[in-house]
């Protein structure tokens, strides 16, 4: 499966993942809204929104 692999303001790239899921995490701090994308569907801390999917990108 192909997932986006991205940290906040960096341009999105793609990565082939064996986990079978992709995630997108968003949260806010003193820098503003932070977005992180990657493979799998990790557990997150309270206050962090996460969306997981099982289709490419």
From Swiss-Prot:
Summary of the tissues where the protein is detected: Expressed by the venom gland.
Alphabetized Pfam families for the sequence: Toxin_cobra-type
One cellular-component annotation, GO: extracellular region
Swiss-Prot/TrEMBL keywords: Acetylcholine receptor inhibiting toxin, Disulfide bond, Ion channel impairing toxin, Neurotoxin, Postsynaptic neurotoxin, Secreted, Toxin
Tree of life domain: Eukaryota
Disulfide bonding pattern of the chain: 3-22, 17-39, 41-52
Keyword presence, Disulfide bond: yes
Subcellular localization, as worded in the UniProt entry: Secreted
Molecular functions per Gene Ontology: acetylcholine receptor inhibitor activity; ion channel regulator activity; toxin activity
PROSITE patterns to which the protein is assigned, alphabetical: SNAKE_TOXIN
Principal cellular location given in the protein's record: secreted
Function: Produces peripheral paralysis by blocking neuromuscular transmission at the postsynaptic site. Binds to and inhibits the endogenous nicotinic acetylcholine receptors (nAChR). This neurotoxin is lethal to mice by intraperitoneal or intravenous injection.
Family statement: Belongs to the three-finger toxin family. Short-chain subfamily. Type I alpha-neurotoxin sub-subfamily.
Protein name as annotated: Three-finger toxin Tschuditoxin-I
